Amino acid sequence: MSHLADALRAATTAVLMGSFACLASTTAAADPNTGNSSDVNTLAGNLSKGYGLNNCTAQPITGSQLAALTCGQSPDPNGPVQAKYFLFSSGDDLANWFKTSIKDDVLTTCGDSSTKGPAPWHQGNATTNAGQVACGTYQDGAEIIWTTDAKNVLSYIRASTTDVPALYQWWRTNG
């Protein structure tokens, strides 16, 4: 009987230790600095084609950000090498972050626009503005930075080259 008692005691200890390990890992994975899961999921619904929570990571939020996601290389080999997405609590905060995010870029025209700098963009065939878009380069990489005003989302994609027109075309197709 003592062998059975020892075996039961060892099994109980193993189960308890495993439960504590699972509990500790769940607590460690929950990071309050990345916002709540509802906001992260809302933001994830606004990612460019090919990106999702399977290849983007929640980042610590600051100020008026509700959620932030950083993504690496697009699954599309012609796509960006990096993307970042931010969800804000208000349109004013979105506009301020947009202005701040483009201030160090060398701005160029976007596509067939004649404007160097921020310009309105339209989603699909819509005639109403969806937000602002800016195209340019920063530290030897092309960048497209845009807002989706109705959703308070700021988005950013970056290429490994300075080919702004190619990145802009990718964005128009997949953005």
Q: Where are the predicted features?
A:
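Exposed beta-strand-loop-beta-strand "reactive/processing" segments of non-cytosolic proteins
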Residues: 67-77
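Sec-exported extracytoplasmic/periplasmic mature domains
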Residues: 48-53, 89, 93, 99-106, ...
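A short acidic-to-branched-hydrophobic micro-motif
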Residues: 78-98, 153-158
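Secretory targeting and sorting signals
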Residues: 1-31
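Extracellularly exposed regions in secreted/surface proteins, prominently low-complexity, repeat-rich
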Residues: 17-18, 30, 35-41, 127-175
